[in-house]
């Protein structure tokens, strides 16, 4: 990997995962001398909260917001969101634009001032062919929308980890936790992104061409066209879990992005 300026990377996981999913990338980046912070969102990884405790995106995103708030005023980070983590980092961009060097969306949801969370959810659902063994929980009754979900071994193997080492898939089957699902009214509460704040942060999108979860043409390219970032990178032969299937290529990509926008 190219030597040069050292950066502080903040890595945010996607749905049902946790800080644990970054272990390969963290090791590579730290070996290059970079500072890396990895966070568990609420009710994720080893965070002590339970999914039933979460009533809004703000509740789920609290660990990231607290972390960003705790940074010294002069410190700026490279904020990286994977999959659903793109929503988390978007909310942080709106509140802390001055603390972010560049935001990197890794085969991720990328809302914007003219593309709200509900529109993303609808587009995502249109490209889902089967939920397979994903388990949905209906704490408000079967006649209402599900309140959480957790991915099962089959959908993880087929759609998330199909090009990743089998031991990483095994790890995931033991460590995934339910992620909260919110109805449209909650999704639209306190989640507005402005051109003045969110819009002033430079954005890079990393496309994974073999992603079976957020498919390249049906979702990733749709996002890029509807909310154009400053730059787009492609990692070839990467499944949804690029940090497992292509950890070195992905880490090199992050360093290259960070040095360009430093």
Q: What is the role of each PLM region?
A:
Residues 94-145, 183-187:
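Flexible "cap/lid" loop of the alpha/beta hydrolase fold
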Residues 243-259:
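Post-His helix in hydrolase/transferase enzymes
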Residues 2-48, 66-70, 74-75:
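Conserved HGGG/HGGXW glycine-rich cap/lid loop of the alpha/beta-hydrolase fold
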